[in-house]
């Protein structure tokens, strides 16, 4: 009897596990993680050939190194990207876009003072480079300089009030100063916006207008292909992670930040700072670095 009972127990457990897994697959919204495309690989090979075989002017070489660095960055190859950016800057030290990328990497590494200097250099070289306000604002946010972060993120928001992610980052900064006032400002921004971009659904969730389930249903309905689904998931899981973190639920936040990273949308702000959030939550840096290079 004992072997028979043991077999029944195992069969029951497998059946229950199968039901559980089926239920999980039906309820979760998942995308195939983004992979390098053939076009990207061909472009990289062509860039390598040009850099190795052609006589380029300094300006041409610096620009090509920058463009290859951007492509490396989009593939999650940050060490190679940093190397190209550093080489480009050594040739042409007046490239604001290079300082911008280096500032982002310094922020991700937690080297906030150096990041501030990099973004200051961007704005000194090109005062109209508005994304430096976003990236410096994020660095100031993680560096604990909340009022300065608010100033930069407000400037970035004012440049395009119909971009929901500008409102979300401003809210995250203002939440640390006055949570009630921050939510009221977010509500005003939502009401004034044209609401055309999908990200306003995340704002609606933050305002309590819709449930998390409704948010995910809208996400799935809005995605036109796997790429847009992966991008929306990277964004949504990051801001859901920040939401749960604000409630003190670090376990849910950790899981959501990992999901944000899992889509391999390497050049999205949400992917970049999900890695930093995981680091701040005590995740192993070597594991995070390895996952980001895959």
From Swiss-Prot:
Pfam families: TPR_16. GO terms for biological process: cell division. Keywords: Cell cycle, Cell division, Cell membrane, Lipoprotein, Membrane, Palmitate, Repeat, Signal, TPR repeat. TPR repeats lie at residues 62-95, 96-129, 234-267. A lipid is attached at residue 19 (N-palmitoyl cysteine). It is found in: Cell membrane. One of its GO terms (cellular component) is plasma membrane. The keyword tRNA processing does not apply. Gene3D superfamilies: Tetratricopeptide repeat domain. Disulfide bonds: none annotated. Residues 1-18 form the signal peptide. It is a lipid-anchor. A lipid is attached at residue 19 (S-diacylglycerol cysteine). Homodimer. NCBIfam families: PRK11189.1 (NF008391). PANTHER family: TETRATRICOPEPTIDE REPEAT PROTEIN 6, UDP-N-ACETYLGLUCOSAMINE--PEPTIDE N-ACETYLGLUCOSAMINYLTRANSFERASE SPINDLY-RELATED. This is Lipoprotein NlpI.
């Amino acid at each position: 009897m004992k072997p028979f009972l043991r077999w029944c127990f195992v069969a029951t457990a497998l059946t229950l596990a199968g039901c559980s897994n089926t239920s999980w697959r039906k309820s979760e919204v998942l995308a195939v993680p983004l992979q390098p495309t053939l076009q990207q690989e061909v472009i990289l090979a062509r860039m390598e050939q040009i850099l190795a075989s052609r006589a380029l002017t300094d300006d041409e070489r610096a620009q090509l190194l920058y463009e290859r660095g951007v492509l490396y960055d989009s593939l999650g190859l940050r060490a190679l990207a940093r190397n190209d950016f550093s080489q480009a800057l050594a040739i042409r030290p007046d490239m604001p876009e290079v300082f911008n990328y280096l500032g982002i990497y310094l922020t991700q590494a937690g080297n906030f003072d150096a990041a501030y200097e990099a973004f200051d250099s961007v704005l000194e070289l090109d005062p109209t480079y508005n994304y430096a306000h976003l990236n410096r604002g994020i660095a100031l946010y993680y560096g604990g300089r909340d009022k300065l972060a608010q100033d930069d993120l407000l400037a970035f928001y004012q440049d395009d009030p119909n971009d929901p992610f500008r409102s979300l980052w401003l809210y995250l900064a203002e939440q640390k100063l006055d949570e009630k006032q921050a939510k009221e400002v977010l509500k005003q921004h939502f009401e004034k916006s044209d609401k055309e971009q999908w990200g306003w659904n995340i704002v609606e969730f933050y305002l309590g207008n819709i449930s998390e389930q409704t948010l995910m249903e809208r996400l799935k309905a809005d995605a036109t292909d796997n790429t847009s689904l992966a991008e929306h998931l990277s964004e949504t899981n990051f801001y859901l992670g920040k939401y749960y973190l604000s409630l003190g639920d670090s376990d849910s936040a950790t899981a959501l930040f990992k999901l944000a990273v899992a889509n391999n949308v390497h050049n999205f702000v949400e992917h970049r700072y999900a890695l930093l959030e995981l680091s701040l939550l005590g995740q192993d840096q070597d594991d995070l670095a390895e996952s980001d290079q895959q």
